[in-house]
Amino acid sequence: MVKDNKIMDRFVSMEKHGCPICGYSDITVLDDFNLTTYEICECCGSESGVEYDQYSTPEAITKVRNEWVVEKRCEWWGDKSSIPKDWVPYSQMKSAGIKVPNRD
């Protein structure tokens, strides 16, 4: 039986660790069964399984990311005392291989 991969090709290939929205590495977004964990990213506040999941399209991920960058100005979502030293959100996204959206 041949599967139609055109539908599956529309989804984002998501890693188990690391936020696909902001690139913050200290989050597990998929469990061992590739199901969402419903963890909330300390950095951007996006919740695995709510704002995005393993079936999200690149456009859906980009929309959530743009909301964080443009509307929320990359504000740290969690406890301010947990912000990493020398944290730069645009560098974090670039390091995670995320195309950094325009700030305007």
Language model features with spans:
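Short, intrinsically disordered terminal segments enriched in charged and Pro/Gly residues
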Residues: 2-11, 56-104
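Short hydrophobic membrane-inserting helices
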Residues: 7-10, 18-20, 30
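Aromatic-acidic/polar surface patches that form glycan- and anion
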Residues: 11-12, 34
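C-terminal, charged low-complexity interaction regions
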Residues: 16-17, 26
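Short cysteine-rich clusters marking metal-coordination/redox-active sites
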Residues: 19-22, 41
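Short Cys/His-rich local motifs and their 1-3 flanking residues in nucleic-acid-associated proteins
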Residues: 24, 46
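Short, non-ligating residues that shape and space the ligands of small metal-coordination modules
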Residues: 28-29, 50-51
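Short linker/helix segments within small regulatory modules
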Residues: 30-39
